[in-house]
């Protein structure tokens, strides 16, 4: 491959404008074809920021790799809010259920350093702490302590055996 471009684009809504267009302009690839391929591959993420890598050759051929959106984007999408709290320890902007935390952990697990779903869930809970999002109405730090105490082993262990 002659070059690689890494960008963050809204799923299914990439366009030839920034950030993609200026990066692709000087390359030999057909910008519109790249945009169409990215939109086809990211349609399921519907507006959520998705990391995309475009690898291209001098002959104009290209390959696209779509990553998993950042954890914060998945949480925002799942909980339905735009920006996190300015005071995340005091002012909470949304609430997630245990099932929503599990779903996000399952989506992110391949990209995380966690060796199992329980630890992936704890990473998601850590991001909830930074954003000001509660889980089951509880402060995320307290929720993490309950995970550590084994209260949710049955929820997160089922996936490990599957």
Curated annotation (Swiss-Prot):
Coiled coil start-end: none
Gene3D superfamilies: Ribosomal protein L11, C-terminal domain (1.10.10.250), Ribosomal protein L11/L12, N-terminal domain (3.30.1550.10)
Described function: Forms part of the ribosomal stalk which helps the ribosome interact with GTP-bound translation factors.
Name the UniProt record assigns to this protein: Large ribosomal subunit protein uL11
PANTHER family named among the record's database cross-references: 60S RIBOSOMAL PROTEIN L12 (PTHR11661), LARGE RIBOSOMAL SUBUNIT PROTEIN UL11M (PTHR11661:SF1)
Pfam families assigned: Ribosomal_L11 (PF00298), Ribosomal_L11_N (PF03946)
GO molecular function per UniProt: large ribosomal subunit rRNA binding; structural constituent of ribosome
SUPFAM superfamilies on file: Ribosomal L11/L12e N-terminal domain, Ribosomal protein L11, C-terminal domain
Species: Haloarcula marismortui (strain ATCC 43049 / DSM 3752 / JCM 8966 / VKM B-1809) (Halobacterium marismortui)
Disordered, as annotated region: 1-27
Keywords in alphabetical order: Ribonucleoprotein, Ribosomal protein, RNA-binding, rRNA-binding
């Amino acid at each position: 491959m002659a070059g690689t471009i890494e960008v963050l684009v809204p799923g299914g809504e990439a366009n030839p404008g920034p950030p993609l267009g200026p990066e692709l302009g000087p390359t030999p690839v057909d910008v519109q074809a790249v945009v169409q391929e990215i939109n086809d591959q990211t349609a399921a993420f519907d507006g959520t920021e998705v990391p995309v890598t475009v690898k291209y050759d001098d002959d104009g051929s290209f390959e696209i790799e779509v990553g998993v959106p950042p954890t914060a984007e998945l949480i925002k999408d799942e909980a339905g809010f735009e920006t996190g709290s300015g005071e995340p320890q005091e002012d909470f902007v949304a609430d997630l259920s245990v099932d929503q935390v599990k779903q996000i952990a399952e989506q992110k697990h391949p990209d995380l350093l966690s060796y199992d779903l329980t630890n992936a869930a704890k990473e998601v809970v850590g991001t909830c702490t930074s954003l000001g999002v509660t889980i089951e109405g509880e402060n995320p730090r307290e929720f993490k302590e309950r995970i550590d105490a084994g209260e949710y082993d049955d929820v997160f262990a089922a996936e490990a055996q599957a």
